[in-house]
């Protein structure tokens, strides 16, 4: 503050000296002497005050900073053993992917890890499962209808009672005998021979089913003998053996 006052007085002295120096030149006009002096003094004082206020503001700003710094120094603790704050930790940048792998490989690896942790699998993974994989997953074995290319032996292992004969139309007669204890249906196999049907049906085959059977075969099948009308080409001796009273004269 003392410096500011000294500066203001110095400025005021210089201004007054200039004012009186200019007033000496105007001594020829005494009527305007007072007016000129006071007007010039007023202007000089106004300029001096403006300059002093501007300089005082700048000094106050510098002084305020010094006072603030002094206050900071005075606020420090007298104890020098206080713990210093820890240094700031270095922030590690988050790695989006490893430098050795490309972003596509990193995303693929991340997806695999996510599926392994959550137990999720893609649709392609399920479509690629084979029959052996399904057997391991399901203890009872796969569904035979689901795998239409399964063989007869695979279905026997899956179903204890054996496969359905209708499901495998190419099964042979021997395979059906093993599946069904009573034997196959004679009508189902049109190409079965007479000997095969005798083994399948104890009473023997139906004579009507085999029209090409001979007279001897029909005698073995029917104890009473064949019908004479059924064999029109029988001879006279054959009819005698068939009818004890002899043949009908009208018939021959």
Curated annotation (Swiss-Prot):
So which residues are the signal peptide here? 1-21
- The segment annotated 6 X approximate repeat A runs over 127-219
Q: Which UniProt keywords apply?
A: Apoplast, Differentiation, Glycoprotein, Host cytoplasm, Repeat, Secreted, Signal
- Top-rank taxon: Eukaryota
> What positions does the record give for glycosylation?
32
Q: Where does the record place its CLE- repeats?
A: 136-147, 157-168, 178-189, 199-210, 220-231, 241-252
Instruction: List every stretch annotated Required for secretion from the host cytoplasm to the host apoplasm.
Output: 21-83
**Tissue specificity comment:** Highly expressed exclusively within the dorsal esophageal gland cell during syncytium formation in host plants.
Q: For bias kind Basic and acidic residues, which ranges apply? A: 125-137, 144-179, 186-200, 207-242
Residue span of region 6 X approximate repeat CLE? 136-252
Q: What molecular function terms (GO) are annotated for this protein?
A: receptor serine/threonine kinase binding
InterPro entries for the chain:
CLV3/ESR (IPR044962)
- A- repeat boundaries on the chain: 127-135, 148-156, 169-177, 190-198, 211-219, 232-240
Region ranges (Disordered) = 116-252
Q: Which GO terms describe its biological process?
A: cell differentiation
Its predominant location is: secreted
Write out the annotated subcellular location. Secreted; Host cytoplasm; Host extracellular space; Secreted, Extracellular space, Apoplast
Q: Which GO terms describe its cellular component?
A: extracellular region; host cell cytoplasm; host extracellular space
Q: Which family does it belong to?
A: Belongs to the CLV3/ESR signal peptide family.
So what does this one do?
Answer: Mimics host plant CLE extracellular signal peptides that regulate cell fate. May play a role in the differentiation or division of feeding cells (syncytia) induced in plant roots during infection.
Q: What is this protein called?
A: CLAVATA3/ESR (CLE)-related protein 4A-2
Q: What is the lineage of its organism?
A: Eukaryota, Metazoa, Ecdysozoa, Nematoda, Chromadorea
């Amino acid at each position: 503050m003392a410096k500011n006052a000294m500066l203001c007085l110095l400025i005021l002295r210089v201004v007054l000296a200039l004012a009186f120096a200019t007033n000496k030149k105007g001594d020829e006009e005494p009527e305007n002497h007072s007016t000129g002096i006071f007007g010039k003094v007023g202007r000089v004082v106004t300029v001096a005050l403006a300059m002093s206020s501007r300089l005082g503001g700048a000094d106050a700003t510098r002084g305020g900073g010094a006072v603030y710094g002094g206050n900071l120094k005075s606020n420090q603790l007298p104890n020098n053993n206080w713990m210093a704050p820890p240094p700031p930790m270095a922030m590690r940048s988050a790695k989006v992917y490893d430098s050795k792998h490309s972003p596509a490989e990193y995303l693929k690896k991340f997806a695999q890890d996510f599926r392994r942790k959550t137990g999720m699998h893609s649709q392609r993974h399920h479509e690629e499962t084979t029959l052996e994989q399904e057997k391991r997953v399901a203890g009872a074995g796969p569904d035979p209808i689901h795998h239409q290319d399964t063989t007869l032996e695979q279905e026997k292992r899956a179903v204890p009672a054996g496969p359905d004969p209708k499901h495998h139309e190419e099964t042979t007669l021997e395979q059906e005998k093993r599946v069904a204890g009573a034997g196959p249906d004679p009508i189902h196999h049109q190409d079965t021979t007479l000997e095969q049907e005798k083994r399948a049906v104890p009473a023997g085959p139906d004579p009507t089913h085999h029209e090409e059977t001979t007279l001897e075969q029909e005698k073995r099948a029917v104890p009473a003998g064949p019908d004479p009308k059924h064999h029109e080409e029988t001879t006279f001796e054959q009819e005698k053996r068939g009818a004890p009273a002899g043949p009908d004269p009208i018939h021959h």
